[in-house]
Amino acid sequence: MDYSYDEDLDELCPVCGDKVSGYHYGLLTCESCKGFFKRTVQNNKHYTCTESQSCKIDKTQRKRCPFCRFQKCLTVGMRLEAVRADRMRGGRNKFGPMYKRDRALKQQKKAQIRANGFKLETGPPMGVPPPPPPAPDYVLPPSLHGPEPKGLAAGPPAGPLGDFGAPALPMAVPGAHGPLAGYLYPAFPGRAIKSEYPEPYASPPQPGLPYGYPEPFSGGPNVPELILQLLQLEPDEDQVRARILGCLQEPTKSRPDQPAAFGLLCRMADQTFISIVDWARRCMVFKELEVADQMTLLQNCWSELLVFDHIYRQVQHGKEGSILLVTGQEVELTTVATQAGSLLHSLVLRAQELVLQLLALQLDRQEFVCLKFIILFSLDLKFLNNHILVKDAQEKANAALLDYTLCHYPHCGDKFQQLLLCLVEVRALSMQAKEYLYHKHLGNEMPRNNLLIEMLQAKQT
């Protein structure tokens, strides 16, 4: 079923930038992309891209590459399950509550606009992505000039999209064992975990836009209950820093040919991930799942959570010329450029571009905790046992973020979509980081007894 919207708000299709005609298959889109998405799903069409799977999709070029257009549809959040399989007109009416909530908030925003006597300014069309970034060239630690990986093999075709717009990784559901087992329950019976593969991304998010948001309102009744609960679950930064510093000071058996800085950074990431696992264990819904589902979710998103943790630390740091480590140490970008390999430098610069975009979006702590929760549950339901509980968490997280952004940032109606697009870039960054770490692992250059190695060993199965 298609829902109407208020034309006074003059929104643009997130796929191609054309004028939207209503709610179609999960979000506001134009008639052209609505029809294209419906035909593709109902006819089970399979497209190929003759270029690099990063074609520009806008109003004038949307028909040139159906592969990239369909990937863009999925990336921005159009729902496969909303298309009727019987080829009848209309979609499945399962997103009605979200449509109604969105429409009510837009009506409220329009009333505020009219009352205040100013016109809503919208950003440029989201269907016009920037040029694709250069080929991934990055190294993890400073002072490392070893051989750089060449010819990274691409994974299998993209899997179905998760419920938050970010592509869900195609992977088998493992049992209640593996590298995470010892962190989820006391026993540590096994090591084997199933494989997870990277997939191409339809398009990166847009560069930072100077929206000029007002400061968000303080907490209170206007903050969704889910976000308030997540704020209470956030770990204390000082305690995390002290624990990680203590672990880094413990002696370890490092490889004689391994640079000290590289080993420290790997241990730093390892301990940060342990903190993330501890956070996940305390999260509502997640702690109610069986261990197999918990491990499946974490194996899907562990690298994204690590990357997003680093990104938000830089957003808080707020300095373009340096990065802040979890230990509190500040590293100048000029130092990274001169002492790190070209691979690490490239990855750091790409991460900093996302930091600038989130600064322009004025990402706040409430949005950060909600996005982190979204990442945790961003796996397609078919890979999980408890569909009902996870689906409920997905829908509530989406609704909470939508409500919060529209209520606290009424001058930018597309902030919700822009934030979800940023998660696509987070996943792309995490895939590149994993590819590098895996090649370092194959080169026998990773530290021993490292949890990240256990996660990376999924590549070998």
UniProtKB/Swiss-Prot annotation:
InterPro entries: NHR-like_dom_sf, NR5-like, Nucl_hrmn_rcpt_lig-bd, Nuclear_hrmn_rcpt, Znf_hrmn_rcpt, Znf_NHR/GATA. Its main location: nucleus. Residues 119-157 are annotated as: Disordered. A zinc finger (NR C4-type) spans 13-33, 49-73. It is found in: Nucleus. Binds DNA as a monomer. Interacts with NR0B2 and PPARGC1A. Part of a complex consisting of SFPQ, NONO and NR5A1. Interacts with NCOA2. Interacts with DGKQ and CDK7. Binds to and activated by HIPK3. This is Steroidogenic factor 1. It comes from Homo sapiens (Human).
